[in-house]
Amino acid sequence: MNASLRRISVTVMALIVLLLLNATMTQVFTADGLRADPRNQRVLLDEYSRQRGQITAGGQLLAYSVATDGRFRFLRVYPNPEVYAPVTGFYSLRYSSTALERAEDPILNGSDRRLFGRRLADFFTGRDPRGGNVDTTINPRIQQAGWDAMQQGCYGPCKGAVVALEPSTGKILALVSSPSYDPNLLASHNPEVQAQAWQRLGDNPASPLTNRAISETYPPGSTFKVITTAAALAAGATETEQLTAAPTIPLPGSTAQLENYGGAPCGDEPTVSLREAFVKSCNTAFVQLGIRTGADALRSMARAFGLDSPPRPTPLQVAESTVGPIPDSAALGMTSIGQKDVALTPLANAEIAATIANGGITMRPYLVGSLKGPDLANISTTVGYQQRRAVSPQVAAKLTELMVGAEKVAQQKGAIPGVQIASKTGTAEHGTDPRHTPPHAWYIAFAPAQAPKVAVAVLVENGADRLSATGGALAAPIGRAVIEAALQGEP
């Protein structure tokens, strides 16, 4: 072989090697990125050529696909959009997907390995490929009640969230976030409609795309006194333990004074029992109780209830709830009443109520009840999973007793005849100027108190003025409406 042919052969071989290397790089290292690139029209056309599966709740359709005559064969439809947007999320040509549309995408688009047999059968029979279906744990009656109550609870719509759990299993029965949005607009095949909707949502200062139930954390205020009380009881305190009834208390090591709501004393005597302090939600008494109990015991109890540890997906991603640093006694006093750096998601606060309702055992919360194939054959069913024991049955029973007493004091409107509720309200200061910022209003509860079927947490964000934005006035009626819906038809 002469030199010229040899050079040509080497050049051709080098080009072949380069082509093979490029193909390997594309297939192995960059394929996922190329598939995920929104500019990849081939992937989009492929995805929208398959009928995406349904998302359901209690037999109701929350999301489904309909055939179109356009370039993209199927359009996503959300029949009750604002109510269920925190659950379904959206599936968009331009803006990807969120919530269950993202978390369960392999099932919904049919690519999940458990649907391989179905895909193979479709290939050989020539059937149009279809995705699987996701059946949620949401109870439509409870979800709708939570949404309706939030829209009417603040002399108009409230900003905030409602979470309802089944204490014995961890099923998420309601997941409400307000304000919400219409995912149909983001799922539109019209680029202009999508873009305008996205712009409006992004410009809205109320952040309707934010799932306040699981993605945001808030100071829990007096609802955290449940944790402080649990820590004290576990350390040997009793309900008759005497605490200060003074209207104000100095925070150790500082010049700051902390006061009770409205600056009122907690009773006519110099001291008050733990029972009375819990029922009346006395800040000064709980500052003293927290300092007596100690930072280590308080933090340990908070961890037992799931704080300060990354939560498992439901399968939606959940923000971590935290106690925050407790460097000194002043910080401990503030932490004991759910202020300082304590921050919880509404889901975490609902878990606290559900744990007490379940005798001290925390069940892992979950949103997906079952996954089904395109033919509705069952793929998997979720069962309740015990995460941990937070407190003893005795402590849980005592907390229930105290919360029943607190409900009787807090009950202003929305009482349910014949139903005993165990609850705790909270009013949480926040922001850089808390004295001039509307506080958050909280309500956590479960019912019936002695045989719980449902546990709830309600957050009303930036409720109103400082005197009317209490958990009892704003959040509690919403929570009771949710409980009433949950107990309809119960014996």
Swiss-Prot record:
Residues 1-7 are cytoplasmic. It catalyses: Preferential cleavage: (Ac)2-L-Lys-D-Ala-|-D-Ala. Also transpeptidation of peptidyl-alanyl moieties that are N-acyl substituents of D-alanine. Its EC number is 3.4.16.4. Inhibited by the antibiotics imipenem, penicillin G, and ceftriaxone. Pfam families: PBP_dimer_2, Transpeptidase. Pathway: Cell wall biogenesis; peptidoglycan biosynthesis. One of its GO terms (biological process) is peptidoglycan biosynthetic process. GO terms for cellular component: cytosol; plasma membrane. It is a single-pass type II membrane protein. Residues 29-491 are periplasmic. Belongs to the transpeptidase family. This is Peptidoglycan D,D-transpeptidase PbpA. It comes from Mycobacterium tuberculosis (strain ATCC 25618 / H37Rv).
